[in-house]
Amino acid sequence: MGATHTIWEDLLDDTSFGLFALHCQSEDHCLAYALNAACGLSLSRTPKDLELGNCACFPVFQWKDEAHFQEWTLFRNTGLSLVAGASGGLFPDQPSEVRHYLVPERREVDYFLKVEGDEDPPGLLDRLLSIPRLVTAYRLDASGLKSKHNLIY
């Protein structure tokens, strides 16, 4: 006989991480470099991007802080995918780009910084706001997001 395994909803609703919204027009690698310098991190690009279905890929930067038992993840909120040209358009043979959002209910946010671990480091928000490339940064309540499951990497 085969065993049936179920996933408890509590595990999917686990939001025991800090989430910060970052508004920044810089490229993702430039922002990761600025975060590393300002916050003492070592974020690096993961070999594999976060894929949502077959529609879009989102770059991810990650760092595991073994000393403080924390895991830091930087997500870009927007991803582009190419779609075959629509018939009847001006350029029917050319593919067009479609913009997708990792967290669609927060389209105004450019990046998300997720901090998993015991607690956020003291003064983190002040250090984020001191980065000249950042327009603004603020803490978000992940439990209120409909698509928080997209942030599980």
Where are these predicted regions, by residue range?
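Short, surface-exposed beta-strand/loop "edge" segments at domain boundaries and coil↔beta transitions
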Residues: S26-Y33, A67-E71, E119-L125
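Surface-exposed, low-hydrophobicity interaction/linker segments
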Residues: L52-P95
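Short, flexible, solvent-exposed loop/turn segments with mixed acidic/basic and small polar residues
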Residues: H5-D13, E97-R107
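Short, surface-exposed beta-edge/turn micro-motifs
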Residues: S16-L19, R107-F112
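Aromatic- and glycine-enriched beta-alpha-beta binding-site module
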Residues: H23-W63
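Terminal, regulation- and interaction-focused segments at domain boundaries
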Residues: E9-S26
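Glycine-rich, aromatic-bearing surface loops/beta-hairpins
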Residues: H100, D110-Y153
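Short N-terminal or domain-adjacent regulatory/targeting segments
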Residues: M1-W8, S87-E97
